[in-house]
Every structure is written in structure tokens, then in C-alpha cells.
């Protein structure tokens, strides 16, 4: 699957570079990843089906963990 990976607080990962997102997505077993610069968030492609991605729901910033 593909989408914006989220942390424990259901928050997307902010980015400024593709390299950061590529590493973040690789850590989550995705095939590729990049920084989607229209909203400055990491986007992953080829994620495992059980990987959490952004859906409807609020970001709870206190839950940030990598």
C-alpha cells in the first residue's frame, strides 16, 4: 500500500528532503519514499499492509516516536 506514514500520535512525518523520507520509509519496509513538498510530509510506496498510514483522525503531537 502507499500513503503518509504516521507516528504513535497519528501525525505525519514532516520533511524537507527526499533522503530523510527514503530512509524513514525503508525503516518501515516500504519499496520507496519521498518528501511530498506540497504539504512537506513523507510519502511511502510499497508499504506492508499492516503499516499505519494517515487516515481521517487528528494528530496528537504528544505521541511522537520513531
Curated annotation (Swiss-Prot):
Q: Which cysteines are joined by disulfide bonds?
A: 11-59, 15-35, 21-42, 25-44
Pfam families in the cross-refs: Toxin_3 (PF00537)
Where found in the cell? Secreted
- Keywords assigned by UniProt, alphabetized: Disulfide bond, Ion channel impairing toxin, Neurotoxin, Secreted, Toxin, Voltage-gated sodium channel impairing toxin
Coiled-coil stretches noted in the UniProt entry, renumbered to this chain: none
Provide the function of this protein: Alpha toxins bind voltage-independently at site-3 of sodium channels (Nav) and inhibit the inactivation of the activated channels, thereby blocking neuronal transmission.
Q: What is this protein called?
A: Putative alpha-neurotoxin RjAa44
> Which source organism?
Rhopalurus junceus (Caribbean blue scorpion)
Amino acid at each position: 500500500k502507499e500513503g503518509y506514514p504516521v507516528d504513535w500520535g497519528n501525525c505525519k512525518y514532516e520533511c524537507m528532503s527526499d533522503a530523510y523520507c527514503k530512509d524513514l520509509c525503508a525503516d518501515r519496509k516500504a519499496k520507496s519514499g519521498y518528501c511530498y513538498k506540497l504539504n512537506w510530509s513523507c510519502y511511502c510506496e510499497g508499504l506492508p499492509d499492516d503499516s499505519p498510514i494517515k487516515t481521517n483522525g487528528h494528530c496528537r503531537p504528544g505521541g511522537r516516536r520513531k
